[in-house]
């Protein structure tokens, strides 16, 4: 319970453990007087209608003597009325102590009829009443008389215990033992109090006596008051006693632990002093002044800017006035060590030989012409203008295409140090900017740590997985990167730990990302985006032959001539055991093949080992990816679309079925909102062109259309399926079949225009990988064809269209006849 001296009717129990007296006085006097008196008022003397005194945050039990301060006007009137009519008053607790003038709904129905033993008027107008609970009672009706509340009450008689005497005695003893345990844990003498408890042999009275002296919430005390059965009431009290004993035990443990901690600190201090004396006798002691001199010397050699030097001198002066073993001195020494070890002036000399840099890039990576050209352009500019600011390049593409390893090769070609910072899953802004030195264990941010590890002012820092930065209540790391990645600001980058500006303008920042849409707009605006699309099968074959196979042979202890594998076998691995835009799975499969061969060699078989296509399944198991047989002609209502995923392009089957119905459109296959809208647009276009396409004009009312895109467990979205949806829908409505060697992509409008989409290279690669002969793309995507190698263009015929009318003649085996209105005929739908 919590008492507030400003409440109108608040118990100021000098006997309870939470009063204003000292703790020892509270505990020693609590039980002795609260046990009641021998001349308790008998229930028959109590009238049935008596004044009500609402209580805040206190419940009065039978036989308990409690002082109350009464301050509310109508409460004062109720007490004064009670003193003139038999001294009896009905005490009931408020459900909400904040209510100033409680009504019947705000009061508990069960309370205690009490006798006013003494009344004293205070100088401020309040009353101080000493009351004794004499009987539980239930309020039947409440009346408002002359400004105060009166109640018609029913006295509640306590039933006789129904348990065996032995069980009753066991409960009484356990309750007393718990009380004794609590008193002992609090260091309160138990003799007198336990004597009082031992004399109370009625379970109900003992429960009330203990409950009146426990720290109980109003709801908990009211629950005990309303419980009439004495054994049940004692059980409730024992539950609270057990909880109180556990809390007291925990308090003792905490106090003991704190005391031991203080003792240990004192012991450590004396041991340190003794250790100092021993070291001094041995001549090993390092004087604090000598240590400061060493730090100062290191700082002088660091070549600090004037602003940083000013802060460092300030910290050195503070350090010189502190005790060497103080915690603050350790923090300052660590800070000064960080300042001394950072590369304030040291830079590495750039390798400006363009031809040598080109050779290094070509040795480490196959293809990637755009990125290599961009790096060589940067070198050329640096050669002509050494003061030029470095670009901030972001390599965007699917996993496994070499974005991270490319950063290391760029650093090697430039002759610079390389540092990588993984940003995946980072949520705390302090990871970038550091923690302020006021925090225990504070450290600089990851950028400053990378600069220290690099040891030069102009390293290459790769910010890996920049699209996977998070944010929460600890801040937004992407916002903290804005300053570091802005060429106009990063010459004065501020780290919270250093609290002095640090120049990052000489750093070449590189970033990698899988999903550009996940990068915040302000951060993306500072990046020069360079896309890394997936590799073609020919590129993968060349990389496997030139880079991956030699690497795996070396890692598995094989020589180059000990494993002979043909291009056909490598193509089979690429085609049937991996399906990705990058190279990671292909490297794993080739590594698995090399391990199998290494085992044969270790078992005593003599190389060389020649791998044939028939042996691939023996070594690598059943092929994981087997393409469906491409049908020359698809069933009506089916068309092949193209989709882009972070892992590369994919073939997308779109199926449309029509049945008799009422014009409902059903879409299944986990379609996103944009794809659903594309389906609606396709349906609207088909309805608007029904006459010219020889489709029944009332098909939208007489049949239901079901559009399904297989792989239902995979979410799909985007506008690029619009052309395919329209083609499949018209195919289903006309009964015409779409060519099986044709795939398509493009956004559709209500007027039938075909709009450009993204991921053209990856989509064309998917069509080639499936063995399709034709692909339809929007005319405005013609510029993207430059990224597609010539060998791929020879394998697939690329058709560019700007309107759906250009798609239909290419899509159907037979051209759909254009029918004028005069010759319009109805054709049954499939």
Curated annotation (Swiss-Prot):
This is Lon protease. ATP-dependent serine protease that mediates the selective degradation of mutant and abnormal proteins as well as certain short-lived regulatory proteins. Required for cellular homeostasis and for survival from DNA damage and developmental changes induced by stress. Degrades polypeptides processively to yield small peptide fragments that are 5 to 10 amino acids long. Binds to DNA in a double-stranded, site-specific manner. The gene is lon. The keyword 4Fe-4S does not apply. SMART domains: AAA (SM00382), LON (SM00464). Homohexamer. Organized in a ring with a central cavity. Its main location: cytoplasm. Residues 1-28 are annotated as: Disordered. Residues 50-245 form the Lon N-terminal domain. Induction: By heat shock. SUPFAM superfamilies: P-loop containing nucleoside triphosphate hydrolases (SSF52540), PUA domain-like (SSF88697), Ribosomal protein S5 domain 2-like (SSF54211). It catalyses: Hydrolysis of proteins in presence of ATP. Gene3D superfamilies: 1.10.8.60, 1.20.5.5270, 1.20.58.1480, 3.30.230.10, LON domain-like, P-loop containing nucleotide triphosphate hydrolases.
């Amino acid at each position: 319970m919590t008492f507030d001296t400003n409440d109108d009717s608040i118990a100021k129990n000098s006997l309870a453990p939470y009063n204003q007296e000292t703790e020892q006085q509270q505990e020693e006097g609590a039980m002795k007087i609260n046990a009641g008196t021998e001349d308790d008022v008998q229930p028959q003397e109590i009238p049935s209608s008596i004044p009500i005194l609402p209580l805040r945050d206190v419940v009065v039990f039978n036989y308990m003597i409690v002082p109350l301060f009464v301050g509310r006007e109508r409460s004062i009137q109720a007490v004064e009325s009670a003193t003139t009519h038999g001294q009896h008053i009905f005490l009931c607790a408020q459900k909400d102590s904040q209510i100033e003038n409680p009504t019947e709904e705000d009061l508990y129905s069960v309370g205690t009829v009490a006798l006013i033993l003494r009344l004293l008027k205070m100088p401020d107008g309040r009353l101080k009443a000493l009351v004794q609970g004499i009987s539980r009672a239930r309020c039947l009706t409440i009346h408002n008389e002359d400004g105060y509340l009166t109640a018609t009450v029913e006295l509640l008689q306590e039933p006789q215990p129904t348990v065996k005497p032995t069980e009753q005695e066991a409960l009484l003893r356990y309750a007393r033992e718990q009380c004794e345990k609590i008193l002992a844990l609090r260091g309160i003498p138990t003799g007198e109090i336990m004597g009082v408890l031992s004399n109370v042999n009625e379970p109900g009275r003992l429960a009330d006596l203990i409950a009146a002296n426990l720290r109980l919430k109003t709801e908990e005390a009211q629950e005990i008051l309303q419980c009439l059965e004495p054994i049940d009431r004692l059980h409730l009290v024992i539950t609270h006693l057990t909880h109180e004993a556990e809390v007291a035990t925990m308090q003792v443990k905490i106090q003991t632990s704190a005391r031991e901690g203080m003792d240990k600190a004192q012991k450590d201090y004396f041991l340190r002093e003794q250790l100092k004396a021993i070291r001094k006798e041995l001549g090993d002691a390092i004087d604090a002044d000598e240590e400061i001199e060493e730090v100062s010397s290191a700082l002088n050699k660091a070549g600090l800017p004037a602003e940083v030097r000013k802060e460092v001198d300030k910290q050195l002066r503070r350090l010189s006035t502190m005790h060497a073993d103080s915690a603050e001195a350790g923090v300052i020494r660590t800070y000064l060590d960080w300042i001394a070890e950072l590369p304030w002036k040291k830079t590495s000399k750039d390798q400006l030989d363009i031809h040598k840099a080109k050779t290094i890039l070509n040795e480490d990576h196959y293809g990637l012409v755009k990125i290599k050209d961009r790096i060589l352009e940067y070198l050329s500019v640096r050669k002509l203008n050494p003061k030029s600011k470095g670009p901030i390049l972001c390599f965007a593409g699917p996993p496994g295409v070499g974005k991270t390893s490319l950063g290391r090769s760029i650093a090697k070609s430039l002759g610079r140090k390389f540092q990588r910072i993984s940003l995946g899953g980072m949520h705390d802004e302090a990871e970038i900017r550091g923690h302020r030195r006021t925090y225990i264990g504070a450290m600089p941010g990851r950028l400053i740590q990378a600069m220290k590890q690099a040891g030069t002012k102009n390293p290459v820092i790769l910010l890996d997985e920049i699209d996977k930065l998070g944010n929460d209540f600890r801040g937004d790391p992407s916002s903290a990167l804005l300053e570091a990645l802005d060429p106009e600001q990063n010459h004065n980058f501020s780290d919270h730990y250093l609290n002095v500006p640090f120049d990052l303008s000489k750093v070449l920042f590189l970033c990698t990302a899988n999903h550009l849409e996940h990068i915040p707009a302000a951060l993306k605006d500072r990046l020069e985006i360079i896309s890394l699309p997936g590799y073609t099968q020919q590129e993968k074959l060349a990389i496997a032959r030139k880079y991956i196979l030699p690497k795996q042979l070396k890692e598995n202890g094989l020589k180059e001539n000990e494993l002979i594998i043909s291009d056909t076998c490598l193509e089979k691995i690429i085609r049937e055991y991996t399906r990705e835009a990058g190279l990671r799975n292909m490297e794993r499969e080739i590594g698995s093949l090399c391990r199998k061969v290494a085992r044969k060699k270790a078992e005593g078989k003599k190389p060389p080992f020649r791998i044939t296509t028939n042996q691939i399944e023996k070594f690598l198991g059943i092929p994981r990816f087997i393409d469906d047989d491409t049908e020359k002609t698809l069933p009506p209502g089916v068309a092949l679309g193209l989709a882009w995923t972070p892992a590369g392009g994919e073939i997308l089957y779109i199926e449309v079925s029509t049945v008799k119905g009422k014009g409902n459109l059903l879409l299944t296959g986990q379609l996103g909102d944009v794809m659903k809208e594309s389906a609606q647009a396709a349906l609207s276009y088909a309805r608007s062109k029904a006459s010219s396409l020889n489709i029944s004009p009332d098909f939208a009312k007489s049949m239901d259309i079901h559009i399904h895109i297989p792989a239902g467990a995979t979410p799909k979205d985007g506008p690029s399926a619009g052309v395919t949806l329209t083609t499949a829908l018209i195919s289903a409505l006309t009964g015409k079949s779409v060519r099986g060697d044709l795939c398509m992509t493009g956004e559709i409008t209500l007027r039938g225009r075909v709009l450009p989409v993204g991921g053209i290279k990856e989509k064309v690669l998917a069509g080639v990988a499936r063995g399709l002969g034709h692909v339809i793309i929007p005319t405005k995507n013609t510029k993207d064809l430059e990224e597609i190698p010539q060998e791929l263009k020879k394998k697939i015929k690329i058709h560019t269209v700007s309107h759906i009318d250009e798609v239909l003649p290419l899509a159907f085996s037979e051209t759909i006849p254009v029918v004028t209105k005069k010759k319009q005929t109805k054709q049954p739908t499939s």
